[in-house]
A protein has these predicted regions:
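Ser/Thr-rich, Pro/Gly/Ala-heavy low-complexity intrinsically disordered linkers and tails
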Residues: 20-80
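Short, intrinsically disordered low-complexity segments
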Residues: 1-2, 25, 53, 506
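Sec-dependent bacterial lipoprotein signal peptides
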Residues: 1-18
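Beta-strand/loop edge motif enriched in small/polar residues
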Residues: 21-26, 76-527
């Protein structure tokens, strides 16, 4: 996360839109289950299509053929998404908020018979549901800061399938990171800030979130891909690929890829949301970022860094921006992660596999951190106390059953850890300043009971290949006697898969979940 400055200069440039139209007609298309009776505005014509049951709000206005209904299941379709040209419809809210923003006040469905152009910033009103069918492509209109914002009490139901994914991408002819915004989901789960507003948007009542409903339900995002987002609204102020603000534990998030974003792939501002099978490809900031009291469960995460000279970390973690003791303290549970870094030339900005700072807690298991400038940095005094389990009352920081290898280190020599690093633990781990050396990450990770692996090469050189990556270690490292199994920890029962007792995001050398299916895309650098 790049910290924010200068909101006031960008208010007039924002435009977010949720809706479905390029005209202002009153016609509504309704899809109805056989045997059901729809509630329809006067003058509308229902279209019967066995399989869905709508509820249409009185007076709803939907343009360009969007379907208004409840978030029921999508109609069954072909095994894969059809190819060919589709008509284009504009997706924009039915209530204009000014400054390029709109609000969708009724439930609405985006169907796969069209491509959808997202025109500006669109807020989904509390009580309304945005349903996006499998095989839908939503293209952010360049120059409008196109972003979907699901407000607390609203829902998004974007449930794709492995071979029939939902794609959110740039509408530009030549696509680049930052062409459009992204997806922001705001909920009513606990955060440690008072009436916070979400990063990337101007401060307003429209962008507040958080509450006391730990099991809040903001819907589902499954088998979906987000590309070329992270629009820059001002200096150090970009929207993440997917942002979660106070999202609750009943929300379903899995099999989501963010690629080529100008900011973080995934950021969690407080909340209790659980997510699994997340892929972050070539971000220009961090892979997975949390703060403001996030306490969810994350499992099966993959990061592939790109060729950018910036402070891009695998994990970047804070309790808040200044490391206060505000409660709840950030304390996620994380397991089964493969972080594939990209060591840059000497003098480039530092990149850490894990940057844990500003009083965060964390329970981290079964991670491979490979190929960063530094494997891990536990930074600042309060965070050191949590790592040493001496921060009164907890929570603490624990990193165990994890493998760290192939770092540039302090000397800038691309030394492979731990060559030379017992004499100088800074190589491959923390920075060289006196403050950072007050905590020795090498010694901390080396405690026998932690079961970390600090001297074995997982041979993941192909994990950096942008078009045909291989994130799997050799077969010998798996199996009953392989280090990635014998040193692994049993995942916490709160995680989606407590049977995943192996280090890294993949069960064995043949497990290819992050490179299989139409929901993920791998292309040469810059494409």
């Amino acid at each position: 996360m790049r910290k924010l400055i200068g909101f006031g200069t960008i208010l007039g440039t924002l435009a977010f839109a949720i809706g479905c139209s390029d005209d202002n007609g009153k016609s509504v298309t309704v899809t109805v289950d056989a045997g059901t009776t729809p509630v329809v505005d006067a003058g509308t014509t229902p279209v019967v299509d066995a399989g869905t049951t709508p509820t249409v709000d009185a007076g709803a206005t939907v343009d360009s053929g969007a379907t208004v209904d409840d978030a029921g299941p999508a109609d069954s379709g072909p095994a894969t998404c059809p190819t060919g040209t589709k008509p284009v419809a504009t997706f924009k809210g039915d209530a204009d908020l000014g400054n390029g923003q709109s609000e969708q006040t009724t439930s609405i469905r985006l169907t796969a018979d069209k491509d959808w152009e997202l025109d500006g910033v669109v807020f989904i009103k509390p009580g309304a549901t945005l349903t996006v069918d499998p095989c839908v492509t939503v293209k952010g209109k360049v120059g409008t800061a196109a972003t979907i914002v699901v407000k607390p009490g609203a829902k998004i139901m974007a449930k794709g399938e492995a071979e029939r994914p939902i794609v959110f991408t740039s509408g530009a002819g030549t696509r680049r990171p930052g062409d459009w915004g992204g997806l922001i989901i705001l909920g009513r789960a606990p955060v440690n800030q008072s009436a916070p507003t979400i990063e990337g948007l101007p401060v307003s009542a429209e962008t507040t979130f958080g509450g006391t409903i730990a099991d809040d339900d903001s819907g589902a995002v499954e088998y979906a891909r987000f590309e070329y987002g992270g629009v820059k609204l001002g200096a150090n102020n970009e929207i993440n690929g997917v942002t979660f603000g106070g999202v609750g534990s009943r929300t379903s998030i899995h099999h989501v890829q963010v690629r080529h974003t100008l900011d973080d792939c995934f950021e969690f501002f407080g909340g209790t949301v659980n997510a699994h099978h997340l892929v972050c490809t070539s971000p220009q900031d961090d892979g997975f970022d949390w703060d403001w009291g996030f306490s969810g469960n994350l499992q099966h995460l993959v990061l592939q860094q790109g060729l950018f000279d910036d402070e891009m970390n695998g994990f970047e973690a804070d309790n808040d921006a200044t490391g206060t003791d505000l409660s709840p303290i950030s304390n996620p549970t994380i397991s089964n992660v493969t972080l594939c870094g990209r060591i840059m030339v000497p003098g480039a900005k530092k990149k850490f596999g894990m940057l844990l700072r500003r009083n965060t807690g964390a329970n981290i298991r079964n991670v491979i951190a490979y190929g960063f400038d530094y494997g891990i940095d536990i930074r600042d005094a309060k965070t050191h106390l949590r790592a040493n389990s001496t921060q009164g009352g907890g929570p603490n920081i624990s990193v165990a059953s994890s493998l760290f290898f192939n770092f540039k280190g302090a000397a800038g020599t691309n030394a492979t850890f731990p060559t030379g690093s017992q004499a100088n633990p800074a190589i491959g781990f923390n920075e060289t300043s006196t403050t950072e050396q007050a905590f020795n990450e090498f010694t901390w990770l080396s405690v026998a009971s932690a079961n970390n692996i600090l001297d074995q090469d997982p041979q993941l050189t192909a994990c950096k290949d942008p078009s045909t990556p291989n994130f799997n270690a050799p077969s010998a490292m798996y199996g009953a006697t392989g280090l990635l199994v014998t040193k692994a920890a049993t995942p916490a029962s709160s995680l989606p898969d407590s049977t995943a007792k192996y280090i890294g995001a993949f069960r064995d050398a043949s497990d290819k979940w992050a490179t299989t299916g139409a929901w993920v895309k791998w292309t040469p650098e810059g494409q």
